[in-house]
Each structure stands twice: as structure tokens, then as C-alpha cells.
Amino acid sequence: MIRSLSYCFLTIYFFLSILPLPNTIACPTRLLCRSDQRDALLEVQKELHVPTTTWNKNVDCCSWDGVTCDAILGELVLSRCKLQGEIPSSIGNLSHLTYLDLSNNQLVGEVPASIGNLNQLESMRLWDNDLKGNIPTSFANLTKLSELYLFGNQFTGGDTVLANLTSLSIIDLSLNYFKSSISADLSGLHNLERFSVYNNSFSGPFPLSLLMIPSLVHIDLSQNHFEGPIDFRNTFSLSRLRVLYVGFNNLDGLIPESISKLVNLEYLDVSHNNFGGQVPRSISKVVNLTSVDLSYNKLEGQVPDFVWRSSKLDYVDLSYNSFNCFAKSVEVIDGASLTMLNLGSNSVDGPFPKWICKVKDLYALDLSNNHFNGSIPQCLKYSTYFHTLNLRNNSLSGVLPNLFIKDSQLRSLDVSSNNLVGKLPKSLINCERIEFLNVKGNKIMDTFPFWLGSLPYLKVLMLGSNAFYGPVYNPSAYLGFPSIRIIDISNNNFVGSLPQDYFANWLEMSLVWSGSDIPQFKYMGNVNFSTYDSIDLVYKGVETDFDRIFEGFNAIDFSGNRFSGHIPGSIGLLSELRLLNLSGNAFTGNIPPSLANITNLESLDLSRNNLSGEIPISLGKLSFLSNTNFSYNHLEGLIPQSTQFATQNCSSFLGNLGLYGFREICGESHHVPVPTTSQQPEEPLSESEDQLLNWIAAAIAFGPGMFCGLVIGHIFTS
């Protein structure tokens, strides 16, 4: 019976010989620990700091915590035990081991050559450590090895030794630093089922010998530097292959017609290569395909018809190619199971493809960055499972129709950069789960949609560059937007003033991420379908496309409208705001000192308003503030002399005649305005200074008077 340790998963089975007893003794025998196995265990414990206190050489090791004596098995499992240091050479003394698992530890250095003594070993798992160097040549002795997991280390070579281990069924060398080409003939690995080397630096031609192994089920060569064409003509034996991943390489040429020989293929990824020409019609014969990724290549011509003629196909990504049209007649088969279609960033033109309405289970559709024209069809309302709809940057016209039925599943809608007119459809209120709404860059004429404020999950609202008009504050309307993180209403015709508490309810922008909640490398969108939300904003003075939006990014852009009155002091509550652009309005009054509370602010643009007073010195303490623009206001006083302000562009302060302190920012050669008397602070004079000034004034007056008197007297006497 295995006794589990409280601080790590530790199981050890050893092949231990049992002392022979006379045949006349009928009572059961007790398994005894062999001394050489016990000593080898103690050596491993000493060098790897195995976390157990019950291993005592004076006690039979069969009773140690985590040790079970078995007459046929020999297993050592020390996974996730926080082991440190190098694998000791003494591990080679455990000669009867059949299973070795040292994964998920902090092991360093090279694998000792003595590991080749474990000639009974069938499974080796060393993944997720910091092991480096070459795979030892002594691995050639591991003729019974069936499973080899070395992924997540720093190995650089020695992989050729594996070509002779004919018992191998699994080889996983992923996430290492292997650099060579796979030149060894692997066709002799007739038991191999899984071969994975993704995220290394392997180079050279595609290893065709892999395709001669009839037992292969899974091949992953992605994220390497393989180059040249790929051909399946001699792969008559690959009838079992289900997974082929070769994305993120330098493969080129045509996708071969011989791909039809992979009759059981289910997952195909050739993305991020240099394949050109048309997709072969023969791919439609691979009837078991469920996921196809051909994105980021140079494919052209007609969109392949297997997209809508397969009953098993679930995921298709054809984005970032040069496809330009659909077939003249598209007939969607009954039972089409497509849930995700990405045709973004191609050159497809013509009207919106209405056949898409017949794909009832469609979950995510991306037709962005093409040349589609005409109106958005009403029939899309019957696609009840829509989660993501991206029609960005086309030439679509007409109104945005009322597509959104009650209990809609829609999470993301992007129709930006088209020619849509009319008003926002009120049916959007049915999209209670929507997080992302982008209608920027159209010709929509409507008032501010206060009614969207009740949507509980709306994070991004992009209304910029349309013809919206009127106030954005209504005391009788609930402003809401409890989850808003990014709002862009720039370049419209909004007017009026904002109350001081206008931003008080935008709680998500004041949320401070802490500990494990920090969304590192997490982006807005659907990760499962690789459909990420994207926006364009003026960021640090430059029009910037955000292909992916970091979850922690918060922005407000109210620029290019006709807002008046004071900037609300409640803006200072939004401590996690990264971008604030209020330029091109008619705001008056002082810059609110509460801006200094926005500790993560990176970009601040208050230019082209009617602001007055001084730039708050406290803004100089914002350590992330890398871009500011205060130009063309009525500001005065000393520019804050902090490091953050000293690195700003000189043009950020132009058009403010009352500002001074430019020398540190603009250099000696720049004209430095001299503060006028009104700009200098007045100090009360002491009594002695006051008397002195009186005497100076009297003397100044007395001199000219005396001179004039002498001249006049001389005239009269003469």
C-alpha cells in the first residue's frame, strides 16, 4: 500500500529480489529490501533533497514512506517535489527501474551518462526542469524505452541517438533549444505514435522519413525553422495520422494534392508559412477534418468549398491570405457543423455572403479587412449561437439591422470602418452578455446611447468618428456602464458639460489588480477560437492599431467634440486609467489636481481647450506618464520640473503664453518666454525697504526738478 506524503506526490516501486526459502515452508514470506537498492535510494535522497524523514537505513526500506516492494515493477515517481540540483549519477544504480518520473522540479545541469544503465526503463519523464546540454549517447542502451518526455528544458542536441530506439511510441522534445536539422532516418521507429518537437530551433527540410512510419498518430513540428516544400506522395502508410501541426515555420511551395492520402486526419495546421497557390480540391477528400488552420500564408484564388461541404468540420481559419472570391454557387450541406470561420484580412469582394445564414451553429465569424459591400442581411438574426461577429473595415452600407434577439449569446460585435448609416439598433439591449461593441468610423447619426449603460458586462464601447450628437449626460437617465474599461466617443458632435461626479460609477477603471488576479498576457476576445478584439486609438499622440487588447488596458477618448465647463474632478478616481484624451473641446477652468491620483496614466492629452491656471506640480510624480500634450490653452506658470516632464516634446506646451520654464525641455536654443510681472509672486516689503524705496523715488523726482529750475533761472537772468 502506497503512503502519500503531504508535501509532494511520491511513489516508489522497486523490483526487489525475494530470498528463496525451502519448499517445505508453507507460511507466507515477507519482502525484504535489497541493500544495494536501499543504498541507491539513500544516495538519491541525499543529492536531490527528497522531502521525507522516514527513510532510515536501519529500517527495511519496504516500510519507508512512499516505497512499496513489488516483484515485477520498478517505479520511481518524484514529480512536483521541489527537487533541486543535478540528477545524481547514482541513479544509474537503480538498474531494475521501469518507470522514472522527475518532472516539474528544479533540476539543473546535464543528464548523467549513467542513466543509460537503466536498461529495463520503459518510461522516462523529465519535463519542466532546467536540464541542459545534449541527450546522452548512453540512451542507446535504453532499448525498452517506450515513452520519452523531455519537454520544457534547455536541451540543445543529441537527438540523433533516438533514431535507434525502436520501442519508442512517444517522443516529446518540445520547448527546448534543439538547433540541428532532423537528418537521421526515423523510419525505423515502427512503434512511434506521437512525435512532438514544437518550439525549438530545428531547421532544414521537412523530415520526410517521419511520413514513412505507419503507426504515427500525432506530428507536431510547429514553431521551428523547417523550410522547403512538403509532399505526401510516398505516405501510403500514414492511414492512422490524426494530427499534423507544422505552423510557424518557413515551409513553401504548394499544399500538395497528395494531402488526400491522410484519410483519417482530423487536425491540420500549416499556418504562418509561405505556402502559395490555391488550396487543392483534394483536401475535400479528407472527410474527417474537424479543424483547419491555413492562416498567414500566400494562398490565393477561390475560397475552398470544403468549408461549407463538410459535416465534421468545426474550425476554419483562412485569414491573412489573398483569397478573392467564393464559388458562383455555394450550397451548404445539411448537417454542416462549422462553428468558427475566419476569413479576415483577405481580398474577397462582392456582397455579404448570405449562405452564411444557413450555417446554423456558427459561433464566431470574422470577415474583417476585405472588400465586402452591400447591406448586412437580416437573416443573420437566425444565427442564434453567434458569440463573435467581426465585419470591420469593409464597404458595407445601409443600416445596422435589428439582428439581436432576446437572450442573444453575442459577446463581441465589430462593424467599424464601414459606411453604415441610421441609428444604433435598440435590439442591442438584448445582448446582455456583450463585452465589446465597436461601430467607430461609420456615418451613424444618433444621440448618446444611455440605454447601453445597463449592459452589465460591456467593457469596450467605440462610437468615435460618426455623427452622434447631443449631451452625454442626462440627469434623468442612468449612466451606468459598470464594467466599462475603454470608451471612445471622439470626433462626433457631442456637447454640454459634465457634472463633477460623472466618472464616479466607472468602477472597473479604478480596480487595482493584485496577486494572482493580475491578467498577465491575457487579452480581450475568445482565446479558444483565436478571435481577439481589436481597436484603434490615438495613443501617445499617434493613431495606433491594437490588434489585441490587454485586459488591464483602460482608456477614455472624448476628443474632437464640443464639451464645455470644467473637467470633472471624479476623473481622479480612475486610478487604473492608462490613456486620457480630452483634446479638441471647449473645457474651461483649471486642470484638476485629482489627475495625480491616476497612478498608471501613460498618455494625457488636454490640448486645444480653454483651460487656465497652472499645470499641477503633482502630475510630475506620475512615473508612467510618458506622453503629455497641454498645447493651445491659456495655461500659465512654471512647467513642472520633473523627470517625466523633462522628457516631453517641446510642442506639448505651445500656445500657452503664460507658461515658462522651457529651457530644461526645449534646450538653450529655443526661445524662452520671460515671466511678466503679473507672473511673479508678490511679497510684502519690510518697513526699511519701503522707506528706502520712498527715498529713491524722491531722489529720482528731485534730480530732474532741480535741473529744470537751474535752466529756467539762467534764462530769466540772461
From Swiss-Prot:
Residue ranges annotated as Extracellular topological domain: 27-695
Signal sequence extent: 1-26
Membrane-spanning residues: 696-716
Annotated glycosylation sites: 93, 141, 164, 199, 288, 373, 393, 528, 581, 597, 610, 629, 649
Stored InterPro entries: Leu-rich_rpt (IPR001611), Leu-rich_rpt_typical-subtyp (IPR003591), LRR_dom_sf (IPR032675), LRR_N_plant-typ (IPR013210), LRR_R13L4/SHOC2-like (IPR055414)
Subcellular location: Cell membrane
Broad class of the protein's primary localization: membrane
UniProt entry keywords in alphabetical sequence: Cell membrane, Glycoprotein, Leucine-rich repeat, Membrane, Receptor, Repeat, Signal, Transmembrane, Transmembrane helix
Coiled coil: none
GO cellular component, one term: plasma membrane
UniProt topology in membrane: Single-pass type I membrane protein
SUPFAM superfamilies for this protein: L domain-like, RNI-like
LRR repeats: 70-94, 95-118, 120-141, 143-165, 166-188, 189-213, 214-238, 239-261, 262-286, 288-310, 312-334, 335-359, 360-383, 384-406, 407-431, 433-454, 455-480, 481-505, 550-574, 575-598, 599-622, 624-647
Segments in the Cytoplasmic topological domain: 717-718
Family: Belongs to the RLP family.
Protein name: Receptor-like protein 36
Species name: Arabidopsis thaliana (Mouse-ear cress)
